[in-house]
């Protein structure tokens, strides 16, 4: 004991004289711990079950879509004989790819030159005889409607109903594609008219 009456070493309490803890309190503590643990496990299991059910539902949906796709593919006739062609392996380096592009470029240029060569005589036709969209009476009235302020979409729909090309409104200086046919029809009409006049 020190001067204040406190023990120097140990608690200074005789444990043999200390009363025991009540059994009811021990049972209450154990019951509370068990209840808390069981509630936590129940909640954890319910959350896991919900997630597993959603995953299983998604898997079922995927299986149904796959079965529908398989049925649609099986309904297409002659699909078993189709083979995938033209699949190229990726080039290992950039060098060979550049060489192949250079090697394939000259034939393309040559083909373009050969295609451009026969088209040159066609463009040598006199520009005065070419019927443009603005000069054609069928398209001229639609161009006037555009200038007045009529909606373009309505005009194009009307042109499509009448069998005309609505894209020609954007290029009024372009040549009418069926102008030659129209000229031939006019010539035929003139010739038939002259024959009828001779017959009279």
UniProtKB/Swiss-Prot annotation:
Source taxon at top rank: Eukaryota
Disordered as annotated region, ranges: 87-130, 165-200
Family that this chain belongs to: Belongs to the CCDC53 family.
PANTHER family from the UniProt entry: PROTEIN AD-016-RELATED, WASH COMPLEX SUBUNIT 3
Subunit-structure text: Component of the WASH complex.
Pfam families reported for this sequence: CCDC53
GO CC annotations, alphabetized: WASH complex
Protein name in UniProt: WASH complex subunit 3
Protein's UniProt keywords contain Coiled coil: yes
Annotated GO biological process: actin filament polymerization; exocytosis
Keywords: Coiled coil
Keyword Transmembrane: no
Lineage: Eukaryota, Metazoa, Chordata, Craniata, Vertebrata
Coiled coil residues, start to end: 56-76
